Amino acid sequence: MNKVLFLCLVVLCATSAFAAEEEYVERAPVKRALLSCRCEGKTEYGDKWLFHGGCPNNYGYNYKCFMKPGAVCCYPQNGR
């Protein structure tokens, strides 16, 4: 009987470990910039971030230009 209980405990631990692993999915943060902007020479709009030294990570931005005062315009716009 002890072997059966031990086996059930092992199965329960393994199932909970795999279930917890599936819940974690790497995604970009939901919060985005509220303002739109356009860099010189670009036709499409980007996201304007205030008080940032550059574009935030994990948002998929691949181009940026700096604007006045203390703002950065990041491309491409995700989700639009």
Curated annotation (Swiss-Prot):
Subcellular location: Secreted; Nematocyst
UniProtKB keywords: Cleavage on pair of basic residues, Disulfide bond, Hydroxylation, Nematocyst, Neurotoxin, Secreted, Signal, Toxin
Subcellular location, principal: secreted
Propeptide section residues: 20-30
Keyword Manganese assigned: no
Function: Neurotoxon that induces paralysis when injected into crabs.
Protein name: Delta-actitoxin-Amc2a
